[in-house]
Amino acid sequence: MNDGKATIVMRLTALWAFSEAFLGGILHAFHLPFTGLILSSIAVLCIVCIALQGYTKGQIIKATLLVLLIKAMISPHTPVSAYVAVLLQGAFCEFIFLLGTPFALSCFIVAIAALMQSAFQKLIILTLLFGVDFWSAMDEFLNSIAKQFGFGTVEYTNYLVLFYLMLHFLVGIVV
């Protein structure tokens, strides 16, 4: 890789790192919704732009490790799950681009997979932390509210989870 492209890759890596550290830190600190959706979208754009500069083996994983290092130094209060998300995204993207599939298809796969990984990670963590009973309790709570307004009982969590996953999937397509 020539010096010009190396400089661009370093700048893109810095952009990714500082978006993870600063924007991610702010979103996590204020517990704002859709943190993973926003940060994953930015990560995908940065990773794809890095690959666009002429992908070489190990390039994305090196950028990922650098992003993790900067994120840990600047925003140490970030939950461990955020670091896991970045590492999984970087490793998966490295794998997809390493396969040598056509660039446009790789970008499409990377975008959808990164956003879906973010969605599933959140759902898995909620289930592990609160158990399956969490979803039953949510249904019970939402049905009690619905009954007050004269609506029947429905498994609302199924619809909420489906909406959440579809939102991430659609953003993955758009990104």
Where does each model-flagged region fall?
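Short helix-perturbing small/polar motifs within transmembrane alpha-helices
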Residues: N2, L12, W16, V84-L123
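General structural signal for secondary-structure boundaries
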Residues: N2-A6, T56, T101, S106, ...
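Hydrophobic transmembrane alpha-helices
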Residues: N2-M73, H77-T78
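Alpha-helical transmembrane segments of multipass membrane proteins
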Residues: W16-G24, A43, I47, V67, ...
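Helix-loop junctions at the membrane-solvent interface of multi-pass transporters
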Residues: I26, F30, G100, T127-L128
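Juxtamembrane membrane-interface segments at transmembrane alpha-helix termini
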Residues: V48-Y55, A72-V80, F95-F103, A119-L126
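"Short basic amphipathic alpha-helical interaction patches in structured regions
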Residues: T64-L66, A82-L87
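Membrane-embedded alpha-helical hairpins and interfacial helices in multi-pass inner-membrane proteins
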Residues: C107-V175
